[in-house]
Each structure stands twice: as C-alpha cells, then as structure tokens.
C-alpha cells in the first residue's frame, strides 16, 4: 500500500471512529462533539499530505482496487480513484466540515440529542467522500443514496414541526426523481458495457450514449436542484443552520454537479447534452436569482443564491469547462458555509428571528459576525481578490469567449448581476440602516466555538481561491487575450448590481405601496411553483381519480349491475304478466285468425 491508499483509509477510519463510539457505552464518558470535531480536524491534516504530493509529482490519477464479488460475467470491485477532483474536494470538504462541526457544538448546545445530530453530520460527510472517491457506479450509488437519506434525517431534525417534516419529504421525493435517472444510467451501462467501472465506461466511449447521459443529467437535476426539480432547496431551510451550511457548501447539492464533472469525458463530444446543460443552467441561475431578490428570510436568500450558483456551474459544464465548474464548487464551499454560519449566529442572537426586515445595524453589536457576513457576500458576487473572484471571473471570461447559444449566456450574465443585488440587499438590511429588533435581546458573540470556525472560513473566503486556482489543470478557454472591457466584465456586472441594489433599497424605504406588485408576487411566491406543483397538480389528479374510482364505480357497478338490473328484471316480468287480462274469446279469435293466415300462405306456396 502506498501513501495515497494509506491516507484515504486512515481518513475513513478516523471518520468512522465517532460512529462506532456512539454505538457503545464510551459515549457517556467523553465529550462527543469535541471528539468528532478533533477527528475531522486530524482527517483534514492527513488529507493535506497526499494533496501536496499529488500536486508536487504532477500525477494524473491513481486507482486502488479490491475484489468484491462476481455476478455472472460482471465483476464488482471496491475501488477508490485518487485524482485531481477527489483529492482536492476531500480536503475542502474536511476543512469546511471541521468548522461546521465546531459551530454545531455552540449552535446545538441546548439540544438534548446533540450527540445524534453530530453523528448524522459525520455520516453525511462520509457518504459524500464515498461518492467523490468512488471508481464504479455501485459505490457512486451508495454515496448518492447516502447523502439523500442523511439529508432527509437532518432536514427533518425538528420532527415536531410540520414544516420540517414536509421539507424533509420534499427533499427525498424530488431526489427520488433524480434517482430514477441514475438507476437508468446504471442499467444501461450494465447491459451495454457489462461493467460499472468508470475507466471501462470512459474507454469504451461511443456516440450512442444519449440514454445514460440523459439519466445522469436527470440525476444531477434532482440532486443539485436545477429548474423543475428545485422547490425542495428553499424548503430545506427548515433544518438547523449547521445542516444548511453543510448541505449547501460541500455535500448534497454539489453532488449532482460533481457527478457530471466525473462523467465529463462522455459529454465532451455530445452537443445535445452540452446544449441541454447550458440552457438548463441558464434558466436555473436566472429564475432562482429573481426569486432571491424579494425574499425576506435570510436563510432562504442564501439558499436561492446556492441554487443560482449551481445553475452557473451547470452553465460552465454546458460550455465544456468541467475544471472551471469544479473550481467554483471548491471556492463556493468556503463563503457559502460562512454565510450560513453568520446568519445562524445572527438568528441565534436575535431570539430565532430570520426576517431581515426585523434586523438592522448589527455592525455595532456584532462586529465580527457582520464583517464576515460582508466578506462572504462580496466573495459571492465575485469581488476582485476574494475567493469567489478566481472562479467567477474565469467563468465569465469563458462565457464571453464562448460561441454557442448567446441567449443562454446573456441570461447568465444578467443573473450574475442579480447576485450582487441580493447580496447588497442582505448587507443593507442586516448591517446598515437603523436597528429594528427588540431592545431587550442579549447578544453575545464571544464564544470560541462560534468565533473560530467563522474565522477559519473567513480566511478561506479571502485566500483559498488564489491557492486553488493556481493548481487547477489548464482549461481550454479559446481566447487568452481580450479587450479590457471583456476582461473586466465580472467586476463591472458586480459593481452595477451593487449600485442598483443600493439605490432600490434606499428608494423602497421611502415608498409606501398600496397594493402588491404582480411582478413582485411572481418572485415572492417562487414563480408559483409550490402552488402549482404541490397544490393544484395533486388536487386535480386526486379529484380525477376520485371521480374515476367513486363516481364511475357508483354509476356503473353499484347502480347498473346490481340494484338497477334487479329492478329492470322485475319490471319486465311484471309487464309480461300484467298483459294477461283474462279475455279468453279475444285470445281464441286472435289464434284463429293467425291459423287461417298461415293456411292461406301455405296453400299459395304450394300453387
């Protein structure tokens, strides 16, 4: 065994040790949240060793395989793939989760089931690492289903609340639709290639692979909340804030994009799939950015920003730039986790208040949290020399030099400016203007379990983009030199968005609206998607099934067959019997006339 395999196994052993301890009596004698946080911290430190060696030696990839089981002619192996994507994402995920775990010990300290909560978060991380390091479809599926199940348990953590249960069910049901696509791809690869190993699938690449690629795209659409299967993502904010931070930064929602990044050799020459990804991502990033503009729940604004960034990653994949999409996954994890943790700190301090209209002037009473919130918001918009800039600027340069589907690319640029608008809206309502919260709230942000994780992620939000961007493989952006106005597009769009948002916020504070604006209603009600998909469609289908099953059953089977058939039979028999009036002479005369007519006809026939 080499250093890479040893490191991966050691990371998994360290992460599994808290799970095993939680099943024994040892959990009663240790500080379980602290133990788990320490395990993840050491796992992160260990993951740096293979990461640095990988970059130093300019390695491409390395596969570690153990035989598992043979089914008929197909051999299943347990194989781990150590390449640029898996080894870098492992370090990023461990660093972010280390901070979230420490934050959870502060945020959930009063919860009686905090040990189980920490265990669920650890399992969430483990299943995501299984997904990223897997080298065959079966292991990918284990990690894929694992993150889905753990998200269901964590979103519905406060199971006494109806909204939390509904949100958890939404997440699992929308992901079931995506799982259908994943299973379709697995079945196709099994039948046509007789293998689930990624190497064999990539080497036997042919042009007749539209069905599995559409299956993988459906899977990514469900998991990464692309347009059409997106309503579960804002609903998932019903879970605790640490769950939202982990879910949106480095686990669940980026799993779909990571899946398409992993299979990018199959999509490179398939123009239909590339165009579909481009248009789907553009539609997602614009729609969710519009929805974020008028939301008032701070967590939902950040959730919609995640969905918008996922759409941007899908656009990048549609432009055939998988390394840029992966770079944005890694940079996005730092500031998105920090944004959620800052919002959690504010919500916790303001007695569980999430409405940004009831905040204001947090800067003076929570200077550290508000400063980090501003840094995270600026990084999200792609402000120069923060982490988000290094990925977003490259993506916008790629958009400007790309020669496919100008409408989709223009929509993406508009959505990017909207990112600056809703980020400025958060900064304006939370940190600026006058205080709008009750004066008797006690605010304390001096706990090291709160300060240290946000501090680490703040450093990551400033410096991580520079470090990661200089270690990604060269991308295939066609034009390496461009005019200054194209080069500064990202900055111009962000600054314009900030200025427009600031002006609009200042104006709306002075206006009095008599009635709701229909355009605002479209954005506030999330494009009427929840109403249509969750209310009208089920109601119509249930009414149709009710009428089909009950009305037709009642009309045909219960009326025509049993009661009405009996009554009809009795009526006919009664009619037959009541026709006999007892007129014997009349009956004999009729009989005689008939006999005479028959004899006449018979005699005519004989002649």
Swiss-Prot record:
Main location: mitochondrion
Keyword line: Electron transport, Membrane, Mitochondrion, Mitochondrion inner membrane, NAD, Respiratory chain, Translocase, Transmembrane, Transmembrane helix, Transport, Ubiquinone
Transmembrane regions: 3-23, 35-55, 84-104, 117-137, 140-160, 171-191, 210-230, 241-261, 272-292, 301-320, 324-344, 365-385, 405-427, 457-477, 482-502, 586-606
Classification via InterPro entries: NADH_DH_su5_C, NADHpl_OxRdtase_5_subgr, ND/Mrp_TM, NU5C-like, Proton_antipo_N
Highest taxon in the source lineage: Eukaryota
Example GO molecular function: NADH dehydrogenase (ubiquinone) activity
Protein topology in the membrane: Multi-pass membrane protein
Location within or outside the cell: Mitochondrion inner membrane
Keyword rRNA processing applies: no
Catalytic reactions on record: a ubiquinone + NADH + 5 H(+)(in) = a ubiquinol + NAD(+) + 4 H(+)(out)
Keyword presence, DNA damage: no
Gene Ontology CC annotations of this record: mitochondrial inner membrane; mitochondrion; respiratory chain complex I
EC number of this enzyme: 7.1.1.2
Enzyme type, top EC level: translocase
GO biological process: aerobic respiration; mitochondrial electron transport, NADH to ubiquinone; mitochondrial respiratory chain complex I assembly; proton motive force-driven mitochondrial ATP synthesis
Function: Core subunit of the mitochondrial membrane respiratory chain NADH dehydrogenase (Complex I) which catalyzes electron transfer from NADH through the respiratory chain, using ubiquinone as an electron acceptor. Essential for the catalytic activity and assembly of complex I.
Family under the similarity heading: Belongs to the complex I subunit 5 family.
Assembly, per entry: Core subunit of respiratory chain NADH dehydrogenase (Complex I) which is composed of 45 different subunits.
Protein name per its UniProtKB record: NADH-ubiquinone oxidoreductase chain 5
Native species: Mus musculus
């Amino acid at each position: 065994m080499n250093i890479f395999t040893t490191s991966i196994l050691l990371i998994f052993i360290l992460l599994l040790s808290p799970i095993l301890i939680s099943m024994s009596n040892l959990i009663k004698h240790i500080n379980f949240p602290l133990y788990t946080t320490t395990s993840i911290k050491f796992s992160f430190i260990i993951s740096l060793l293979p990461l640095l060696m990988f970059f130093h030696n300019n390695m491409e990839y390395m596969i570690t395989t153990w035989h598992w089981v043979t089914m008929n002619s197909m051999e299943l192996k347990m194989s781990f793939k150590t390449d640029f994507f898996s080894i870098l994402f492992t370090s990023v995920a461990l660093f972010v989760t280390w901070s979230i775990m420490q934050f959870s010990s502060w945020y959930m300290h009063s919860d009686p089931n905090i040990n189980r909560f920490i265990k669920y978060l650890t399992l969430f991380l483990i299943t995501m690492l299984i997904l990223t390091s897997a080298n065959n479809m079966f292991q990918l599926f284990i990690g894929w289903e694992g993150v889905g199940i753990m998200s269901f348990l964590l979103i519905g953590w406060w199971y006494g609340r109806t909204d939390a249960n509904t949100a958890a069910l939404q997440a699992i049901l929308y992901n079931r639709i995506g799982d259908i696509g994943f299973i379709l791809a697995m079945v196709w690869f099994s039948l046509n290639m007789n293998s689930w190993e990624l190497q064999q699938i990539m080497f036997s690449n042919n042009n007749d692979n539209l069905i599995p690629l559409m299956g993988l795209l459906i899977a990514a659409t469900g998991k990464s909340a692309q347009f059409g299967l997106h309503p579960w993502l804002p609903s998932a904010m019903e879970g605790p804030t640490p769950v939202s931070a982990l879910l949106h930064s480095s686990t669940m929602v980026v799993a779909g994009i990571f899946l398409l990044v992993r299979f990018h050799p199959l999509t490179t020459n398939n123009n239909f799939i590339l165009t579909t990804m481009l248009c789907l991502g553009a539609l997602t990033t614009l729609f969710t950015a519009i929805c974020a503009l008028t939301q008032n729940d701070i967590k939902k604004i950040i959730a919609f920003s995640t969905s918008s960034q996922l759409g941007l990653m899908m656009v990048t994949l549609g432009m055939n730039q998988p390394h840029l999409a992966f770079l944005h996954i890694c940079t996005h994890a730092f500031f998105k986790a920090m944004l959620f943790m800052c919002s959690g700190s504010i919500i916790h301090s303001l007695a569980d208040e999430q409405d940004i209209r009831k905040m204001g002037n947090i800067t003076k009473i929570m200077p550290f949290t508000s400063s980090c919130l501003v840094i995270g918001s600026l990084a999200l918009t792609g402000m120069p020399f923060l982490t988000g800039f290094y990925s977003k600027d490259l993506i916008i340069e790629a958009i400007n030099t790309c020669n496919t589907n100008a409408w989709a690319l223009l929509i993406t640029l508009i959505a990017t400016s909207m990112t600056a608008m809703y980020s400025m809206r958060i900064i304006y309502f939370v940190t600026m203007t006058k205080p709008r919260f009750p004066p008797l709230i006690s605010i304390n942000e001096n706990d090291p379990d709160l300060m240290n994780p946000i501090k680490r992620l703040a450093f990551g939000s400033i410096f991580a983009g520079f470090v990661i961007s200089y270690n990604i493989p060269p991308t295939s952006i066609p034009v390496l030199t461009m005019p200054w106005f194209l080069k500064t597009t990202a900055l111009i769009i962000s600054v314009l968005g900030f200025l427009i948002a600031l002006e609009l916020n200042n104006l709306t504070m002075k206006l009095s609206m008599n009635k709701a604006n229909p355009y605002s209603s479209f954005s506030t009600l999330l494009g009427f998607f929840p109403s249509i998909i969750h209310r009208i469609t089920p109601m119509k289908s249930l009414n149709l099934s009710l009428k089909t099953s009950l009305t037709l059953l009642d009309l045909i089977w219960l009326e025509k067959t049993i009661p009405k058939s009996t009554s009809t039979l009795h009526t006919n028999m009664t009619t037959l019997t009541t026709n006999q009036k007892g007129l014997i002479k009349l009956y004999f005369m009729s009989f005689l006339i008939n006999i005479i007519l028959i004899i006449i006809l018979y005699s005519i026939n004989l002649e």
